[in-house]
C-alpha cells in the first residue's frame, strides 16, 4: 500500500511549506490542496528560478505528479486563470496536470468587495485579511447559498443563481457599507467565458484518491496558512476561515481519515505572523529587524512585512497536539546564523503572575502574556546550504535537539536555504 503524507504549517503560516511539498513530490503521484484559497503564497526555488503559487498545488512543476484542488478550497476563477497563464507561458502544461473538485465554492467579485468593505469598516480592529474574498466565500458555503464549480455545467441555471446572490450581496454593499455595487453582467460574462476550461478539469476527487490509495500510489496533502490560524483552533478571531489542521484533510478532499499515514509539521526556526492578532514572542528591537531582513519576511501574497519573533515552543506544542504530528521539517535555520544568542519561549507568564505551559483558548486570554525564554548560544558559522547533518555547527545542532525535547517530535527534515537542493532529509516521510 502507498503512503499518504500531510504537510502543514505549525505556526501562523509562511513556514516554508511550498518548498517542502515540491521537494517531497519527487516520489508522489498526487498532490492535493484541501483548504484555503489564493490567500496562500507558496514559494518554490528550483535551480535559482523562483515560482510563487497561490492556488495551484506545489506539485504542478513535476511531470509525474497530478495536482488536485479539493472541495475544501475556495476557488477564484480569475486567480486560477492568471496562475495557469503564468505557468503555461513558461511551458508547464497545467491543464494536463491539474484536476478540480466540482464541490469547490467559487470566489466571485462580491466576495472581494465584502472582504475589503468589512476590513475598512473595522478600522483599528481589522483582522488583517488578504482582501481576496476568502472569508465571505466560506460564509456563503456554510449559509448554503454559495455557487460551486459544479454550477458551471449548466450555464442557464448558473446565470439565475448568480443574479440572486449578486442582488443579495449588493444590498449589503450599497446600503450598509456605502460602497459600489458589483456588476452582475460583467461577472456573469467573465465566468461563462472560462466555464468550459474549469469544467474540463473536474473529477470525482474522493473516488480518484481512493483508487490511488488502493493501487499503492503516494499521495501528498498540501496545507495552506498554519495551525494557529485555524478557524476553530487558532487565535480566534484573528484566524483564517478554514480548517488548516490535519482534521481538514479528510473533509477538504474526501479521503478517509484512517488513510493518513504521516503528518509533517513545518516549523520555522523563529516565529512570524502577518496581520493582527496575538504574538507573544514578537520582537520590536534590532533582532526583530535582523530576522525580517535576513529571512526576507515579506508576504508572497500581499507583500506585507511580517512580524517577527523568537520560536514559541508552547504554541508549537499545541500544533503537535492538534495535528498528531509525526515529525518536523525545520526551515530557515540559516536565518539565525550570526546571532550571539538564540531564544526559545518555553512558557507564558500571565498578568496575575501565574505561569502556563499551554496556549490560552480565547484571544482575550493572550492579552498581557509575557514569554518565558530559555537562552542558548548562537553560532557564527554559516548553515546556509549545508546538506549534511554532521556539518552543522554544534550550537545549531543543540538548538535542534532542544526543539525536539520541548515538543516531543523528531526533526526529520532540515531546510538550510530556499532552493530545493538546500535540504537534509534525515527520515523520509514516505518511508517512516
Curated annotation (Swiss-Prot):
InterPro entries found in the cross-reference section: Adenylosuccin_syn_GTP-bd, Adenylosuccin_syn_Lys_AS, Adenylosuccinate_synth_dom1, Adenylosuccinate_synth_dom2, Adenylosuccinate_synth_dom3, Adenylosuccinate_synthetase, P-loop_NTPase
Cofactor: Mg(2+)
Pathway note: Purine metabolism; AMP biosynthesis via de novo pathway; AMP from IMP: step 1/2
Main location: cytoplasm
Catalytic activity: IMP + L-aspartate + GTP = N(6)-(1,2-dicarboxyethyl)-AMP + GDP + phosphate + 2 H(+)
Gene3D superfamilies the record matches: Adenylosuccinate Synthetase, subunit A, domain 1, Adenylosuccinate Synthetase, subunit A, domain 2, Adenylosuccinate Synthetase, subunit A, domain 3
Binding-site list for Mg(2+): 14, 41
Annotated residues for binding of GTP: 13-19, 41-43, 306, 332-334, 415-417
Subcellular location: Cytoplasm
Positions contributing to substrate binding: 300-306
Keyword line: Cytoplasm, GTP-binding, Ligase, Magnesium, Metal-binding, Nucleotide-binding, Purine biosynthesis
EC number: 6.3.4.4
CC cofactor note: Binds 1 Mg(2+) ion per subunit.
Family the UniProt entry places it in: Belongs to the adenylosuccinate synthetase family.
Role noted for this protein: Plays an important role in the de novo pathway of purine nucleotide biosynthesis. Catalyzes the first committed step in the biosynthesis of AMP from IMP.
Oligomeric form and interacting partners: Homodimer.
The protein's name in its UniProt record: Adenylosuccinate synthetase
Gene: purA
Amino acid at each position: 500500500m502507498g503512503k499518504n503524507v500531510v504537510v502543514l504549517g505549525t505556526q501562523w503560516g509562511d513556514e516554508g511549506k511550498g518548498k517542502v511539498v515540491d521537494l517531497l513530490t519527487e516520489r508522489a503521484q498526487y498532490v492535493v490542496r484541501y483548504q484555503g484559497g489564493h490567500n496562500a503564497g507558496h514559494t518554490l526555488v528550483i535551480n535559482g528560478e523562483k515560482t510563487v503559487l497561490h492556488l495551484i498545488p506545489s506539485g504542478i512543476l513535476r511531470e509525474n505528479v497530478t495536482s488536485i484542488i479539493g472541495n475544501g478550497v475556495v476557488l477564484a476563477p480569475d486567480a486560477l486563470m492568471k496562475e495557469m497563464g503564468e505557468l503555461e507561458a513558461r511551458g508547464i502544461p497545467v491543464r494536463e496536470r491539474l484536476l478540480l473538485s466540482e464541490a469547490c465554492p467559487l470566489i466571485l467579485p462580491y466576495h472581494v468587495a465584502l472582504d475589503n468593505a468589512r476590513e475598512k469598516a473595522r478600522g483599528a480592529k481589522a483582522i488583517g485579511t488578504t482582501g481576496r474574498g476568502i472569508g465571505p466565500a466560506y460564509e456563503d458555503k456554510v449559509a448554503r447559498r454559495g455557487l460551486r464549480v459544479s454550477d458551471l455545467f449548466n450555464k442557464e441555471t448558473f446565470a439565475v443563481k448568480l443574479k440572486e446572490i449578486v442582488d443579495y450581496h449588493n444590498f449589503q454593499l450599497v446600503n450598509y457599507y456605502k460602497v459600489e455595487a458589483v456588476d452582475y453582467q460583467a461577472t456573469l460574462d467573465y465566468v461563462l467565458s472560462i466555464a468550459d476550461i474549469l469544467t474540463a478539469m473536474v473529477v470525482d476527487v474522493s473516488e480518484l484518491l481512493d483508487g490511488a490509495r488502493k493501487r499503492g500510489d503516494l499521495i501528498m496533502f498540501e496545507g495552506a496558512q498554519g495551525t494557529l490560524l485555524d478557524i476553530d483552533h487558532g487565535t480566534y478571531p484573528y484566524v483564517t476561515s478554514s480548517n488548516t489542521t490535519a482534521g481538514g484533510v479528510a473533509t477538504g478532499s474526501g479521503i478517509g481519515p484512517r488513510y493518513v499515514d504521516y503528518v509533517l509539521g513545518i516549523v520555522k526556526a523563529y516565529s512570524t505572523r502577518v496581520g493582527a492578532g496575538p504574538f507573544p514572542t514578537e520582537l520590536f528591537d534590532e533582532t526583530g529587524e535582523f530576522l525580517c531582513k535576513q529571512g526576507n519576511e515579506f508576504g508572497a501574497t500581499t507583500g506585507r512585512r511580517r512580524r517577527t519573533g523568537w520560536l514559541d515552543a508552547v504554541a508549537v506544542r499545541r500544533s503537535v497536539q492538534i495535528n498528531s504530528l509525526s515529525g518536523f521539517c525545520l526551515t530557515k535555520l540559516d536565518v539565525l546564523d550570526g546571532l550571539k544568542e538564540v531564544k526559545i519561549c518555553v512558557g507564558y507568564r500571565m498578568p496575575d503572575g501565574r505561569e502556563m505551559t499551554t496556549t490560552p483558548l480565547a484571544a482575550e486570554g493572550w492579552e498581557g502574556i509575557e514569554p518565558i525564554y530559555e537562552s542558548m548560544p548562537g553560532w557564527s558559522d554559516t548553515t546556509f546550504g549545508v546538506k549534511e547533518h554532521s556539518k552543522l555547527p554544534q550550537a545549531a545542532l543543540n538548538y535542534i535537539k532542544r526543539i525536539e525535547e520541548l515538543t516531543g517530535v523528531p526533526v526529520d527534515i532540515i531546510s538550510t536555504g530556499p532552493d530545493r537542493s538546500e535540504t537534509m532529509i534525515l527520515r523520509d516521510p514516505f518511508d517512516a
